[in-house]
Amino acid sequence: ILFLLINLVKRKLLPHLSIWIDSPMASATTHLTQRYFSELDAQSQHTFSWFQEHPDAVNLRFIADVEESKALNRIKGGAIIISASGMCDAGRVVHHLLSNLPHEQNAVVITGFQAYGSLGRRLVDKVKKVRIFGEEVMVRASIHTIGGLSAHADQAGLLDWLRGFKQAPKTVFVVHGEAESSSVFAACIREELDWKEVIIPERLHTYSC
């Protein structure tokens, strides 16, 4: 996401803006990416090199502690807050949603898969109000979704990974994904890899292998 934003600024499609990275994991992975810069593809290297040469083009800041994170919600004027927290059910992003959802001048952009029943999914489904920390919050901010940015492998990628096993596992458990997609993926494993013991666990069930 950060690379996309920097690239938009580079192409003059976004004005000079402030970007706040408010996620310990996102901060760590960003610094890790910088460390292994040479492993990036050519386009990413070019974008990153441009940013190093034009550090003032983007006001980029990494947030360290929780109090500093909460202070972001008092910002006046335009800013982008990147806060990673899966389904929006926990972590720093919840405080940002509590503060920013009620205001129509704000926008929330969700880039990852949101499971049914999660706060993120309710926002994607364009509900009018949500409950956060026991408080009813009106959703007046505009909600946007961008596909294709998930860090998870797709069906083809997962099947390729499974094909790398030298010996087929005794049992495969499909534990991530909604019911329909899990059933389809389990069927693919059985048919394409000829692995018969593929289980989709149900809530509170236990298995002994």
Residue ranges and their predicted role:
Residues 1-209:
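Acidic/His-rich, metal-assisted hydrolase cores and their charged scaffolds
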